Amino acid sequence: MRALVTGGAGFIGSHLIDRLVARGDHVVVLDNLSSGHLSFIQEHLDNGNATLVQADITQFDEVMGAMKGIDCVYHLAANPDIRLGTRITDTDLKQGTLATYNIVEAMRLNNVGTIAFASSSVVYGEDAPLPTPESHGPCMPISLYGASKQAGEGLISSWVGTFGIQAYIFRFANIIGTRGTHGVIFDFIHKLKKDPSRLEVLGNGLQEKSYMEVGDCADAILHVMSCSNDSLNLYNLGSHDTASVRRIAEIVVETTGCHDASIEYTGGDRGWAGDIPRAMLGIEKMLSTGFDVRYNSEEAIRHTALALIEEIGLNTEMNS
């Protein structure tokens, strides 16, 4: 099997590639390396199990070149900074919606039959019931990132209906873990690295969401694809519970050893424009396939904090 992974040098993509290579696939990594890291996939490049195409998925000709001879696409590339869309408003249009069009059109022209798409819980918006099932609708996202993910789902669904491809759409909870390059835990650790005496938290700390460990996420993708064979397959991927931003701050302060740090809240019920204060995905459909997660939200947070502290070198630097 020849698999194309967009964003493959990134956080989730590199973990997925580890598993694809382990099962014997050859992987073509399509990544512009704007936020990805070669070190995440270097072993696979060195041993010939993966090939890097350093290109931008917003450029159709470059996508076409990478698509030749591919059997299955894992489309994970997107704007990694949700807040950026509030300042540069065409970011998600270009890196999300139009890039997804380039992917599915290049698939059509190269007779590639299957795509797995990384969507997000943010497509549901903030008025959905909790936990939110896949059947909830209409989806009314409140961020430009969420709008681009919903548009990507629509494009893929239309390619299924019009051109007969097979698609797996995965709506992710908040994915965290080793190799993380952004997100609340990453941000908190860097803030404490800069100033161990205080930790600023955006919002009131009561925002509460589901967190899924990245290895669980990658395993869930491949498990669902192995046992679900409809033309269009839609699954929420998440954990059984939630954790608050306040609790995340407490765990990060504890694991970094910055016990004297004061946790200071900026106020308000959301961290930024477009942030959803409370989110929890219904995962009964995922569980019905026989897959379950290894970590609950708090366990995933603690595991991630410890891993990122080591990766960032926080304790070494603070103790030197």
Q: Predicted segments — roles?
A:
Residues M1-I175:
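N-terminal Rossmann-like NAD(P)+-binding domain of SDR-like oxidoreductases, especially those catalyzing
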Residues E126-A128, T178-G180, V184, K285:
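Short beta-loop-alpha junction of Rossmann-like oxidoreductase domains
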Residues G36, T58, R87, Q95-L98, ...:
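Residue-level signal for the nucleotide or nucleotide-sugar donor/cofactor binding architecture
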